[in-house]
Amino acid sequence: MRVFIDEIARHVDQEVELRGWLYQRRSKGKIHFLILRDGTGFLQATVVQGEVPEAVFREADHLPQETALRVWGRVREDRRAPGGFELAVRDLQVVSRPQGEYPIGPKEHGIDFLMDHRHLWLRHRRPFAVMRIRDELERAIHEFFGERGFLRFDAPILTPSAVEGTTELFEVELFDGEKAYLSQSGQLYAEAGALAFAKVYTFGPTFRAERSKTRRHLLEFWMVEPEVAFMTHEENMALQEELVSFLVARVLERRSRELEMLGRDPKALEPAAEGHYPRLTYKEAVALVNRIAQEDPEVPPLPYGEDFGAPHEAALSRRFDRPVFVERYPARIKAFYMEPDPEDPELVLNDDLLAPEGYGEIIGGSQRIHDLELLRRKIQEFGLPEEVYDWYLDLRRFGSVPHSGFGLGLERTVAWICGLAHVREAIPFPRMYTRMRP
């Protein structure tokens, strides 16, 4: 009976067949210890001289890393074994042998070497754990919104304009010289969806042509972007907190083994799963950052009216044991579509959610302008071509209502939950300013 490693605990004292690859091998006297991987996990298999045919024992002594195998044996519970279970091998069959020396040996390798061999590095424990947690988060995102009646709404990748009105766009030449751009966000289209279906979410790749080499930036990354008709700024933040606490709780519940493989202390994530996220206004956050800057020379001062940089977000988020909201930024440093604060029109009803431990922003959200004339004026003030946004203005001409939404960056969220130093490890094949291969 063929089984997978992630279900091995259900087959103790049973004869099973595993199909996978040799990850590591060592020998001690009359025992060969084989660490097998099958894509669902890692398992120790023991080949004992006298308990298998002599030809099998000799074969096991010469298997190179990444040999593809079929292995038959009995599952045993053994606390000494990695994972608490092992396979007592009865027989094995080589399916294929590596053609040459496998590049990623047991010695230490630098990150550039590992990224050059990302197609092979994905087979190792650390990327295995990260990708399993990423998969868990993606599944949980769909479950969260599905259970709350949201419609999955697919936004286009090719767009005629930028959402934020920036120049950080990847340009694509279409037929007859017409130009389009790879999407920076599905937000504008999600707004159309919200006014048709009340509550929607998009989930897909987005692209930013930023010449940035920081640990938080990729050229291609994934975002989930919900949008809800009649939702206020306060309700928007409540939904963000509900989502993030749900995601963290799900990983703690189902992926504790992978967190352990990464050396990630689950206790560091427990406050985020509880909710009760602190809230600071932009003004309060600037004041706190400047107090920190007086104590820490590595944190630059932040003049009021400027946006937070990575050092400011990191310093601020380290002061909290769970994500923290920063809300109501000056309008002049935020996007054209954000609703002004009725108590102070110089501010907007927006928020950023900063992950703790120095990870910084993982969500940006706002209430959207729903007044036609105000939105038209903002488009003009930002110097954007009104004809490109005419369809977007139609959303305000016909049945306009207050509405809100946000975008959660998947890779930044994965990096925080996994405790990664760089978002390049949070996606299977990172696309960066300095890297496009493999």
UniProtKB/Swiss-Prot annotation:
One of its GO terms (cellular component) is cytoplasm. It catalyses: tRNA(Asn) + L-asparagine + ATP = L-asparaginyl-tRNA(Asn) + AMP + diphosphate + H(+). Its EC number is 6.1.1.22. It is an enzyme of class 6 (ligase). Keywords: Aminoacyl-tRNA synthetase, ATP-binding, Cytoplasm, Ligase, Nucleotide-binding, Protein biosynthesis. One of its GO terms (molecular function) is nucleic acid binding. Its main location: cytoplasm. GO terms for biological process: asparaginyl-tRNA aminoacylation. Pfam families: tRNA-synt_2, tRNA_anti-codon. It is found in: Cytoplasm. NCBIfam families: asnS, PRK03932.1. HAMAP family: Asn_tRNA_synth (MF_00534). Homodimer. Belongs to the class-II aminoacyl-tRNA synthetase family. This is Asparagine--tRNA ligase. It comes from Thermus thermophilus (strain ATCC 27634 / DSM 579 / HB8). The lineage of its organism: Bacteria, Thermotogati, Deinococcota, Deinococci, Thermales.
